[in-house]
């Protein structure tokens, strides 16, 4: 007796193909984050390709740029750079004694540069800049800077601090609304 069959999600909706691409992208991002060239203290850092089955594409919280899994082809060889530039999503938490918009702008510019040098593309980044955790492991919650869905195309020197500040404020408003 079959209780649960995953053929529909894994094969027909191309879930296995999306998982394979996502795993390769995550490995490429991890290689950068785990390297000596990554200059930041971070306990959370990873990369994903945003995929969604067509039946969930309109749900709350699904990014507009997510790739519809049903449109993938089984067993096709895909270009990670192309997928990264369309739907690559980095998540990075950085600990620093300096938590300012200027420092977060510096971090974003450095991460973009490092990923560019390693040929790994991304579309957006979520990045949290926070104080180091104390010895007891408790997180200070008095101040942090955070950008959510910060576009790769918005990471450049000119007026970077303003874009970071604007996104931080929008992100705080987003989380406030989600908590209500």
Regions found by a protein language model. Give the residues of each.
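N-terminal "mature head" segments of proteins
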Residues: 1-2
């Amino acid at each position: 007796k079959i209780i649960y069959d995953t053929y529909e999600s894994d094969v027909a909706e191309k879930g296995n193909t999306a998982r394979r691409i996502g795993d390769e992208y995550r490995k490429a991002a991890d290689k950068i984050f785990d390297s000596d060239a990554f200059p930041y203290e971070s306990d959370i850092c990873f990369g994903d390709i945003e995929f969604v089955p067509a039946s969930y594409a309109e749900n709350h919280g699904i990014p507009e740029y997510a790739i519809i899994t049903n449109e993938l082809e089984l067993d096709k060889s895909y270009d990670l750079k192309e997928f990264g530039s369309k739907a690559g999503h980095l998540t990075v938490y950085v600990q620093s004694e300096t938590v300012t918009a200027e420092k977060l702008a510096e971090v974003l510019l450095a991460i973009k540069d490092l990923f560019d040098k390693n040929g790994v593309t991304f579309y957006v980044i979520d990045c949290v800049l926070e104080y180091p955790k104390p010895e007891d492991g408790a997180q200070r919650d008095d101040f942090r800077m955070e950008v959510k869905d910060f576009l790769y195309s918005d990471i450049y020197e000119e007026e970077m601090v303003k874009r970071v500040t604007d996104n931080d404020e929008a992100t705080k408003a987003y989380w406030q609304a989600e908590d209500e």
